[in-house]
Amino acid sequence: MRLFRQLSIQWKITILSFGIVAFALMMVSISLLGYVTSIKEDELSNRTMITAQLVAQNHTVQQWVDAKPEEASRTLQPIVERIRVINDHDYIVLLNMDRIRITHPIPERLQTPFVGGDEDPAFAEHIYLSKAKTEGVVTVRAFMPILNQQREQVGVAVVGSVLPSYADMIQEFWQPALLIGLITALFGFWGSWLLASHIKRQTFNMEPDELAHLLVERDASFNAIHEGVVAINKHEKITIMNEAARRMLGVKEKAIGRNIHEVIPDTKLPEILSIGKPLYQREFYIQGRLVFSNRIPIQIDGETVGAIAIFQDKSDVDRLAEELTGVQAFVDALRVQNHEYSNKLHTIAGLIQLDEGKKALQYIFDLEEEQEEFSGVVMQKIHNDSLAGLLLGKVSRGKELGVQVIIEKDSEFIDHPEGVTTHDLVVIVGNLIDNSLDAFSSTQDQNKTVHVFIGEENDFLKIRVRDNGEGIREEVREKMFVRGFSTKSTSGRGIGLFLIQAIVERVEGKIEVESELNIGTTFSIYLPKKRG
């Protein structure tokens, strides 16, 4: 046993597999031996019965079997012996009605009483087979009544054949059986070795103790990672879940080996198995915490055999958070507003120097009315300081670019939809307005307008941004939501629509895009007030 434990896994598998093959071969051989013996017995039984019928129907036998025993034996013994030899039976015995042997292969037993104990039914004209063990062998015997021409019973024909034993069958078939056994054993050993070699290659030629050590190292490495890591196999069973993932997902019970839907009901990791492509920086909420995930398929030889997800907390991705909050957009808005009011102050100062005080005062009133009209819509209808500030900044930015950004008067924002944060709204509105402003970069039209609507429609918060810019070409529409795709050559572009789509998908909303070249584009975002 100690020697067996010291063998490599390849030799262990080979020996075990070959042992199973050898055991199966032995069981099959025993079963086959019994089956062949049974067939042989059936064959002998049929032959014995046919011969008994042939003897009983012989006219000479019918005429002489009830004669005097001495005369009957002299007449019938040669005839019956010839039939016995030809048909290869061990004995044929004819009995008269006094149960005296008229014929027998052993002459000393002629004219002696039959001793068997199973012949009574035959003297009542019954036809049957029986088995008897005599002198250490088992014989099958056919009993056939002998009837004369008047259909009267005059005797009984008994035909017996010795049944072959298992030893006889082995002796008869040992040569072909040995040849088949050797060939089977050879192929069994060869197949076992191939199987063991295949398993060895599948385990990267590593022994079980090496695999166990590697598994321990892997678990330690994953648990040392600050990000949450979850991996599944192609059957959607969890194979990896480190401690960080347990904390983020709030999982306390055993997770390894369970279906991921049982542990994380709203998971989207299994979809990676079907699409076979990675998804980066997708956001969603876990236990009230906004996280980002990278989901990557695990592929071997081009086949997807699993998927792995890496979760990152929002606080760990400051760079992406800065893109979401639109800090740069507010800085630009302040710069534009400073420049705009500087020009207005210069105008007022000039009117005062020209002693046009009434005109200066009227100019101030006009500015105040214009500002109140615009600010009234934004500040009174948009009950979110960050979103209102963003809209004011975008209006100012539009003026700098010669584009009129119009906040529609029927806009109204009161409360966030379920699962949508202020950052999400800033990302959606800010990027849509920026895209509309960019749509005028190559147009010479003087009437450049962008209409923005934010309000409730049925059970959705609707965000609509409509411009009369250059429109979107068909080839661009097919790829505009892909991360990194942009029609601009500026570095860092191509993330806005990708982020919008990620937010909308997370809250199970929808995006509608209508665009015609040289006419304009309309983006409509629908965010459900309540999910589910």
Curated annotation (Swiss-Prot):
Topology term for the membrane: Multi-pass membrane protein
MF-aspect GO terms: ATP binding; phosphorelay sensor kinase activity
Entry keywords, A to Z: ATP-binding, Cell membrane, Kinase, Membrane, Nucleotide-binding, Phosphoprotein, Transferase, Transmembrane, Transmembrane helix, Two-component regulatory system
Domain Histidine kinase intervals: 315-531
Segments passing through the bilayer: 13-33, 176-196
UniProt-listed SMART domains: HATPase_c, PAS
Residue(s) carrying Phosphohistidine: 339
Main subcellular location of this protein, as a coarse class: membrane
Record topological domains on the Cytoplasmic side: 1-12, 197-532
Residue ranges, Extracellular side: 34-175
GO-annotated biological processes: regulation of DNA-templated transcription
Top-level class of the enzyme under EC nomenclature: transferase
Chain's role: Member of the two-component regulatory system DctS/DctR. Probably activates DctR by phosphorylation. Essential for expression of dctP.
Protein name, entry field: Probable C4-dicarboxylate sensor kinase
Classification lineage: Bacteria, Bacillati, Bacillota, Bacilli, Bacillales
Recorded name of the encoding gene: dctS
